Amino acid sequence: MNLLIMGLPGAGKGTQAAKIVEKFNVAHISTGDMFRAAMANQTEMGILAKSYIDKGDLVPDEVTNGIVKERLVQDDIKEKGFLLDGYPRTIEQAHALDENLADLGIELQGVINIEIDPSKLVERLSGRIIHKETGETFHKVFNPPVGDYKEEDFYQREDDKPESVKRRLEVNIAQGQPIIDHYRAKGLVHDIEGDQDIDLVFQAIDTVLSKLQ
């Protein structure tokens, strides 16, 4: 099976990706792992990517797309198929992926889209607090500190504050929605309700993927 998984930050995409890989034995292609491997193996695109990263520059799309293409021709993909996680991030990358898959004779079979109301994600993502003395991490709702603590004993990182989280989600929605629309027009998108127990989310994914096998 050849799949994409999509979802906003905090939607549980990483957790579900791991479960899909374990159950369906597909190769997990995550952007970070792919870049690290390409640079470590000094592939043509890996060397190019490193030259940008070393200068502190953003890696251009054509290099990112090239790294993905290099990964897609490897033996484990031919044997098992893949789950792409964290790519494409823009509609331009989605078009490049379509072209690369067509060049390689690979068919994309499904896009798993984990959906959660963004306002609930703000609560999930902005609840993290850190104890000033110990550095221990808690969550205001899901893992509150127990014991003789005061509010002033904790601090919150700037990018965990609600306004920062909202801005981050807005950027992700603006970039991600055109990609989902693009694949929905091809009949590939399977929407999964993400605001439920982790096992129930996977149950829904499992039902979809079992039909695609």
Curated annotation (Swiss-Prot):
What reaction gets catalysed by this protein? AMP + ATP = 2 ADP
- Localization per record: Cytoplasm
Q: What ranges does the record give for the region LID, renumbered to this chain?
A: 127-160
Keywords per UniProt: ATP-binding, Cytoplasm, Kinase, Nucleotide biosynthesis, Nucleotide-binding, Transferase
**Pfam families (UniProt xref):** ADK (PF00406)
- Principal EC category: transferase
Specify which residues bind AMP according to the UniProt entry for this protein: T31, R36, D57, L58, V59, G86, Y87, P88, R89, Q93, R157, R168
Gene Ontology MF: a single term:
adenylate kinase activity
InterPro entries assigned to the protein according to its UniProt record, in alphabetical order: Adenyl_kin_sub (IPR006259), Adenylat/UMP-CMP_kin (IPR000850), Adenylat_kinase_CS (IPR033690), P-loop_NTPase (IPR027417)
UniProt-annotated stretches for the region NMP: 30-59
Q: What is known of its domains?
A: Consists of three domains, a large central CORE domain and two small peripheral domains, NMPbind and LID, which undergo movements during catalysis. The LID domain closes over the site of phosphoryl transfer upon ATP binding. Assembling and dissambling the active center during each catalytic cycle provides an effective means to prevent ATP hydrolysis.
Family the UniProt entry places it in: Belongs to the adenylate kinase family.
Protein task: Catalyzes the reversible transfer of the terminal phosphate group between ATP and AMP. Plays an important role in cellular energy homeostasis and in adenine nucleotide metabolism.
What name does this protein carry? Adenylate kinase
